[in-house]
Amino acid sequence: MQLPPHPTSSRLPVESRISCDRTHLRYDICSISGPNVLDPTTSTFFATGPTSPTRSVLVEKIRPYPRKFEGLVMSQIKDLILTSGPQRPSCKVHHKVPALVFSAGGYTGNFFHDFNDGLIPLFITVDTIFPDRDFVIVVAEAPDWWPSKYAELLHMFTKHPIITLENEISTHCFPYAKIGLVTHGFMTVNQTLIPNSKTLTHFRDILGKAYGHQNQHPSSNTNHTRSRPRLVLACRQNAAGRSILNRDKVIRMIKRVGFDVVIFEPNANTSLRKSYKLIHSSHVLVGVHGAALTHSLFLRPGSVFLQVIPIGVEWAADAFFGRVARGLNLEYLEYRIGIEESSLVEKYGRDNALLKDPFSLQKNGWPTEIMNIYLKKQNVKLDLVRFKGYLKEAYRKAKKLMQKET
């Protein structure tokens, strides 16, 4: 994709042309190819460069959040306006580099969606459009905590300060602007659609630079001198649904198999640097399907990732985490619970279609009422005998990793 040149005094003024690509299922993306001014109080970009005298005033609206296919959440995303109209505010803050604008509204605050709908699309967009990393992030609808929580990672993409739209009152001028984020699908970086054949492993490398200790191999960490591999059990804190009802018994069994166990209950205030250090230096991550398993991005190659899959979420479990694990060269195991291990059996009975044939209820989509049953009303009581076999396999793979790193 060819970018417009930065305007200089030796060049003719760059025409400010507004264009939008609305051909994609998951996202729209718009451009202002020349000088423009942002009025944050109205969420409007004004094209300020010369325009063709035969071209009428153009107004485009975009909701720059990459879930265009999901009408309900998109209805909650604010429109940004792009216009070539004649009434243009004066500029207070001048930038020599372009703007990349997107929304951190929608599902932001859910750790999975922070990555799936925000940070991974940001990686794709930056590598596709701004490979020199010389641009300003302008983020709309960001919660107050968002810029600080992800500051270390955001500064892997750009050295310039982040502009949060709702906290600004001054107008900002840019040589050109891109509005929207490119996504390749759920937790996906498609190497055929991105320059230099980048993949999710390159995104993981950026996570390591942001949160890890550079030039330190995990085996040099004192935690890896131990004889027992470390297993991190990700648990849902004060959450409705997908809890392990016999957690204490499971933990005792994990220890008997030969692991040291760390209970990981992340929340909105959990330090990403501390989380990265814990997960990256451990040998196994285990958890019931849910947002916390997004931390599997922090695992190093060869680590074991064991996902416990409740009834009815098989497709999501593979699309969100299974394919990711295989692509990141993790030792991926999945434990699909049986009917008797689901708490739903007590309410609906083992012969109910919800338990016996969940695919028949989802063949035309995932209605909210069905999704809520599987995700919010279902807990798991693991079959200790059957689950022990998976733990033994995880232990074997973890010991193999330890031997490789010594």
What does each model-identified segment do?
Residues 1-406:
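The feature primarily captures lumenal catalytic ectodomains
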